[in-house]
Regions:
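A short, glycine/small-residue-rich beta-strand->loop->alpha-helix junction that serves as a flexible
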Residues: 18-33, 102-106
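Active-site proximal beta-strand in glycosyltransferases
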Residues: 14, 126-129, 140-159
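Short, solvent-exposed amphipathic helices
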Residues: 130-134
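Short beta-strand/turn micro-motifs composed of small residues
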Residues: 18, 50-52, 150
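A conserved catalytic-core segment of Leloir-type glycosyltransferases
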Residues: 2-12, 47-117
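A short, Lys/Arg-enriched amphipathic alpha-helix followed by its capping loop at the start of a domain
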Residues: 35-44
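Glycine-rich phosphate-binding loop signature in dinucleotide/nucleotide-binding domains
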Residues: 119-124
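Nucleotide-sugar donor phosphate/pyrophosphate-binding loop at the beta->alpha transition
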Residues: 105-112, 144-145, 155-164
Length: 164
């Protein structure tokens, strides 16, 4: 047994977070698909918690959708959500951040993920946060060991998308 109480040879139950899972542009969706498949191939159990656009995953992997206001979708990027779309506290916060010029997706997603994961803390051995880095991740980390992957600043994703 490890100091964390886990058998180092036993497969892990992993909650994998990706606030955007775009399958063909930006890298997060592609990285998510290949990494989670490799983890399952190694014998681990993986559940992906994702925001729009949702990733395309191996059929052995569960996707738990954490819908956002999707203000930066492909068809109408920067759209202004209607008041009827604000159904939760997280929606209201996402809208407030959006109105102040802040890119709201990571922060809002992390809050949604914390609300979803903290009651389920006993179901997972590890959380892998794929570049979200929002404040909600700190809440999750209080209950479940967490690792983070940071690929590059988010401004690079936008530059790449705008150039194509």
């Amino acid at each position: 047994m490890s100091h964390a109480g886990l058998d180092p040879d036993a497969p892990l139950k992993i909650a994998y977070l990706t606030y955007r899972g775009k399958p063909h542009v930006g890298g997060q969706g592609v990285y998510t698909r290949h990494l989670t498949k490799a983890l399952v191939d190694l014998g681990h159990t993986v559940e992906v918690f994702g925001g729009q656009p949702y990733p395309i995953l191996d059929e052995r992997i569960t996707l738990t959708k954490l819908p956002s206001l999707d203000t930066f979708n492909d068809y109408f990027p920067g759209r202004f959500p209607g008041f009827w779309e604000l159904k939760t506290r997280d929606d209201a916060l996402e809208m407030a951040w959006f109105m102040t010029g802040v890119f709201p997706e990571p922060r809002a997603f992390s809050s949604r993920a914390a609300r979803e994961l903290t009651p389920r803390a006993g179901e997972f051995d590890l959380v892998h946060d794929n570049q979200c880095l929002g404040y909600g991740i700190l809440k999750i980390e209080e209950k479940i060991p967490t690792i983070v992957t940071l690929h590059h600043p988010i401004t690079k994703d936008r530059e790449l998308e705008m150039s194509h």
